[in-house]
């Protein structure tokens, strides 16, 4: 009988012990967690000046000072929920803000780069190094952080080649050669030697004589590629002779076809794009559809992205523009990529590669040979 009593007494004791432990665990779990500290910036009112006073304000509120700034009247502090409340209510505190985290802004790759498969050639290590590209335009903002202008010339009175009061030339230059520097945008050929040849004034206009002078300068100074995102409705014997001479000397000459759109069977391509020695470039959008403004005609050679193109712009910023002016530099950059991989090719060979490997899009009157494919052209 005594054994049975001892047995049940033991069982009762064990049960109470387990119950107590379980209850204790539950009670512990129900306890509120300790307030988590977070980083804040605490700003002080103008009357609070000394470091010791600032430190005391935060310390007396239950926080801890990590750093005091040298110029602004503020300190970085660690505060839990209660300390945060106390600091906010302190009459000597002007503001309290969370110490947020910033991130490096990634480089934007405009849609035109993968559309023409320039990224594939860049990935092979060919980015236009040792190739000289002259942008004949409104000048280039040479101080733009995403551009590296190595030289140039101006044929516009009173305007330097390394400035751009219009924006057109800087935008075109970025499509050709915006740097691969983890910020801003990426150009088709980011490692080219970029030259600014100003032939258009800050209003976006320029004389044919100025353009001829720019072409001659580029030819004389050993440019490998000339881009002309410009055009006129009238032909010019002098301009034709200038581009013919450049092409004969081994320069790949690229020009915008024009923004006159289509009107039945009417040829709307402008000059100098209309000349045989020049690659006339039309514009497509991100879906490879011909842009409605893109000029048409028998001289149209290839198409490139020209609708909604994002690129560099003055001053130290970026902009989205439309036009065959935006398409032409894609082709100029593509020519530079081909030459960086195959430096011994002639201008006519580069041109033939671009046109013969283009992706067919439709009638040559509207699309030329089609959308350029730099990966195929650079094989």
UniProtKB/Swiss-Prot annotation:
Domain Peptidase S8, first and last residues per copy: 110-378
UniProt EC number: 3.4.21.62
Signal peptide start and end residues: 1-29
Positions contributing to Ca(2+) 2 binding: 273, 275, 278
Catalytic site: 137 (charge relay system), 168 (charge relay system), 325 (charge relay system)
UniProt KW Metal-binding keyword: yes
Keywords tagged on the record: Calcium, Hydrolase, Metal-binding, Protease, Secreted, Serine protease, Signal, Zymogen
Keyword hit for Repeat: no
Gene Ontology biological process: proteolysis
Pfam families, A to Z: Inhibitor_I9 (PF05922), Peptidase_S8 (PF00082)
GO cellular component, one term: extracellular space
Subcellular location: Secreted
Protein name: Subtilisin Carlsberg
Species in which this protein is naturally found: Bacillus licheniformis
UniProt gene name: subC
């Amino acid at each position: 009988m005594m054994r049975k009593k001892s047995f049940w007494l033991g069982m009762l004791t064990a049960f109470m012990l387990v119950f107590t432990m379980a209850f204790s665990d539950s009670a512990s779990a129900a306890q509120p967690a300790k307030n988590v500290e977070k980083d804040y910036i605490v700003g002080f009112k103008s009357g609070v000046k000394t470091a010791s006073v600032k430190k005391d304000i935060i310390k007396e509120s239950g926080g801890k000072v990590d750093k005091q700034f040298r110029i602004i009247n503020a300190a970085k502090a660690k505060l839990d929920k209660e300390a945060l409340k106390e600091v906010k209510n302190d009459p000597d505190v002007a503001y309290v803000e969370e110490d947020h985290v910033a991130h490096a802004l990634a480089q934007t790759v405009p849609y035109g780069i993968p559309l023409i498969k320039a990224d594939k050639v860049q990935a092979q290590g060919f980015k236009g190094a040792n190739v000289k590209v002259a942008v004949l335009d409104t000048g280039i903002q040479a101080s733009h952080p995403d551009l590296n202008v190595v030289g140039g010339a101006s044929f516009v009175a009173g305007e330097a080649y390394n400035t751009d009061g219009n924006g057109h030339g800087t935008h075109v230059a970025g499509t050709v050669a915006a740097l691969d520097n983890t910020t801003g945008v990426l150009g088709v050929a980011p490692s080219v030697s970029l030259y600014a040849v100003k032939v258009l004034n800050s209003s976006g206009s320029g004389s044919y004589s100025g353009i001829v002078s720019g072409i001659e300068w580029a030819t004389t100074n050993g440019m490998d590629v000339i881009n002309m995102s410009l055009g006129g409705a009238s032909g010019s014997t002098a301009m034709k002779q200038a581009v013919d001479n450049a092409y004969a000397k081994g320069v790949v000459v690229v020009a915008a076809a024009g923004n006159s759109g289509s009107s039945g069977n009417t040829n709307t391509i402008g000059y100098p794009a209309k000349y045989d020695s020049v690659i006339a470039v039309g514009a497509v959008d991100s879906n490879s559809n011909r842009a409605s403004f893109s000029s048409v005609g028998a001289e149209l050679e290839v198409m490139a992205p020209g609708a909604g193109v994002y690129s560099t712009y003055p001053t130290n910023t970026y902009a989205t523009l439309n036009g065959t002016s935006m398409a032409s530099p894609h082709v100029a950059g593509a020519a530079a990529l081909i030459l960086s991989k195959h430096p011994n090719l002639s201008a006519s060979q580069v041109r033939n590669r671009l046109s013969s490997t283009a992706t067919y899009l439709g009638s040559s009157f509207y699309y030329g040979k089609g959308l350029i494919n730099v990966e195929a052209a650079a094989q």
